Regions:
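Short, conserved catalytic-motif segment at the N-terminal edge
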Residues: 1-20, 40-42, 56-68, 208
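Short, surface-exposed loop or secondary-structure junction motifs
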Residues: 46-273
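Short gly/ser-rich anion-binding loops that grip negatively charged ligand groups
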Residues: 17, 22, 84-87
């Protein structure tokens, strides 16, 4: 129903390709839980176990009052308040990142400070993710829930790469997309599918369409897919981790993903409760 390209009056069809944006995150969540089920990763593991740059992070707080460490929820990087840095009370863990409670790139004061740093396009997870260890945290790990739109979950994607020995895109292709029959889901849309891409109304689509293929396979954003393909992924979750006789995760793991992981702060593991 509807139009896939309003200005040109082109009708929507079942094979149209959508920009999935943050619907990439549940795919990362399934990949992470595969690592956990296989005993390669524990939620309580510090990220520095794989990426040493995350060992000694700092948290941004307002300069005043000095007797309190206040981390504001939202800050404009072009209008930074006076601030100071304090040591993180503990290292951030896999669980912190999966539940958006790490303080990494969550839109607060630390993010505003970190946004002043290198803004060159990322090359790949291997070379880019260690740089995130130099970012300033928005709040003390585990003390708050605050959504990380485009950075934190890439750390988990890199851990999946390290433990699996595969680039993240190849891992999800082999372990998730192929078993589910998701043949129309990619980070880089093949040339023969370009004319099927849905045009977002009143948006400059050149930033999505007129770009070279990426080598940075984010766990936070970037996938393109069809409604039919993504329905297969969601149906697997509804079915308790299985579709077409192919089991990706155990029912127990799926229940864990959908349960409150933050003592009421907000989310499950990469899925909204």
């Amino acid at each position: 129903h509807g139009l896939m390209d309003v200005p040109n009056n082109r009708e929507m069809t079942r094979d149209n390709v959508f920009i999935m944006m943050s619907s990439t995150k549940p795919v990362l969540g399934v990949a992470a839980m595969m690592m956990i089920e296989e005993g390669l990763v524990r939620p309580s593991d510090p990220v520095s176990k794989w990426i040493p740059e995350f060992a000694d992070m700092q948290v941004a707080v307002l300069a005043d009052p000095v007797e309190e460490n206040i981390s504001p929820v939202s800050v404009n990087s072009n209008n930074l308040p006076a601030y100071r840095l304090v040591p993180a009370a503990r290292e951030i863990t896999v669980h912190d990142i999966l539940t958006h409670t790490s303080g990494l790139a969550s839109g607060g004061l630390g993010s505003a400070i970190s946004n002043q740093a290198d803004r060159r396009p990322p090359a790949n997870l291997e070379t880019t993710v260690p740089k995130f260890g130099g970012y300033v945290l928005d709040f003390q790990p585990g003390s708050r829930w605050q959504y990380s739109a485009a950075t934190a979950l890439d750390v988990i994607a890199r851990i999946v790469e390290i433990e699996s020995g595969l680039p993240f895109d190849q891992f999800v292709q082999q372990r998730i997309f192929e078993p589910l029959g998701m043949s129309n889901t990619w980070w880089n849309v093949p040339p023969e599918y370009q004319d099927r891409r849905v045009v977002i109304v009143d948006r400059d689509m050149s930033r999505f369409f007129d770009v070279p293929d990426t080598t940075y396979f984010s766990g936070s954003y970037g996938l393109n897919s069809t409604a039919d393909d993504y329905l297969r992924f969601e149906q697997m979750l509804v079915n308790g981790g299985e579709l077409f006789g192919n089991r990706l995760l155990s029912p127990r793991t799926i229940r864990m993903m959908a349960s409150d992981q933050t003592n009421g702060l907000y989310q499950g593991i990469s899925r909204r409760v």
